[in-house]
């Protein structure tokens, strides 16, 4: 297996956590949020702005190697709401990081 490229910067990760203001999946407001790849590394995902969301340890462990939409359906979470919010936040973070640079 080729080594995956990971290009999520510390500034992007910090901005993602601030924008989500908690777990992207369940909304838990914790300080120990973890980087979760919506498309898992095991399935070709990478640690990038487009693929990472903050997750509480419980959601991160539950999602494990599932692709995000199948996991959201299994957990009976609002898939459309999550995906729309993820795109909005990703665009906002990308624009704010670009403005700084």
Walk through the language-model features, giving the residues of each.
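Short, charged surface segments at domain edges that flank catalytic/cofactor-binding sites
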Residues: 1-22, 82-98
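A detector for short metal-coordination/catalytic motifs
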Residues: 50, 61-101
């Amino acid at each position: 297996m080729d080594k995956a490229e990971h290009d999520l910067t510390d500034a992007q990760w910090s901005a993602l956590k601030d924008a989500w203001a908690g777990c992207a999946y369940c909304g838990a407001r914790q300080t120990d949020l973890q980087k979760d790849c919506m498309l898992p590394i095991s399935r070709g995902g990478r640690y990038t702005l487009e693929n990472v969301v903050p997750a509480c340890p419980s959601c991160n462990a539950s999602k494990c190697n599932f692709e995000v939409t199948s996991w959201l359906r299994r957990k009976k979470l609002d898939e459309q709401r999550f995906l729309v919010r993820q795109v909005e936040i990703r665009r906002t973070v990308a624009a704010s990081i670009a403005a700084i640079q």
